Amino acid sequence: MSHRPILKNFPQVDHHQASGKLGDLYNDIHDTLRVPWVAFGIRVMSQFEHFVPAAWEALKPQISTRYAEEGADKVREAAIIPGSAPANPTPALLANGWSEEEIAKLKATLDGLNYGNPKYLILISAWNEAWHGRDAGGGAGKRLDSVQSERLPYGLPQGVEKFHLIDPEAADDQVQCLLRDIRDAFLHHGPASDYRVLAAWPDYLEIAFRDTLKPVALTTEFELTTSRIRKIAREHVRGFDGAGGVAWRDMADRMTPEEIAGLTGVLFMYNRFIADITVAIIRLKQAFGSAEDATENKFRVWPTEKG
């Protein structure tokens, strides 16, 4: 009798499974957004053959702008849960034998996640709004100015490498249980990419879940914070020069009614899921220092103000 894993991988086209045109698209997402992983939601939606290529083609010119980057900054800055700061895990990590260098590497990983998550919230907001025919750009009648339309450099920031996401099914039972417990605490459907990255340090992730995440999971403060950043993202995409996605009515010749219905649910789910993860991972970095440090764009291309 085969061993039944504690945690089953949610259906998706994972990084190592994407080849050909889809592999090229994943790399283009990496380099356009300057992020070291392709979001869980995109990997799930890539099972709908025609959607992600069409939605990305529409969004790419919009999300590669300074305006989009500023929107992600606004999301990040608003993602702090009100109330007391979480306990700093550094003493516990040092007691577990961690070196300062290892802690610095962990913090840098959190910075990479916190750079990317708000950008993915902008992305999923644009895709979800456009899917339903709501304003996801191009409807304001006012185009971006020359500063707002400046382009991000193409490619990962200097010194940043693509993340390795552990395979939940192949992880040991302790890690699988931990990923399952985090999933269930937030009523999610599967472990986020972020936790698959952080599972490389299971002792840290266990401390982080127990002391930083579990106490706020599903609280009113957490839910209000995620609602706030979803609103910021939704309002920001309306300022794009063109629609940041595709409407389901325009995909009806390439998708079955069942696929359209299924994808509608997936978009709705990830619009909330990515907001949850954005708030959670910023809180993990906040525990190491301050809200200001946790919400800072560590890979800023332009100064906060032009000049």
Swiss-Prot record:
Changing N117D: Less than 10% activity. It comes from the Bacteria. Changing R43A: Almost no effect. Changing R134A: 50% activity of wild-type. One of its GO terms (molecular function) is 2-haloacid dehalogenase (configuration-inverting) activity. It catalyses: an (S)-2-haloacid + H2O = a (2R)-2-hydroxycarboxylate + a halide anion + H(+); an (R)-2-haloacid + H2O = a (2S)-2-hydroxycarboxylate + a halide anion + H(+). Coiled coil: none annotated. Acts on 2-haloalkanoic acids whose carbon chain lengths are five or less. Homodimer. Belongs to the HAD-like hydrolase superfamily. S-2-haloalkanoic acid dehalogenase family. This is 2-haloacid dehalogenase, configuration-inverting. It comes from Pseudomonas sp. (strain 113).
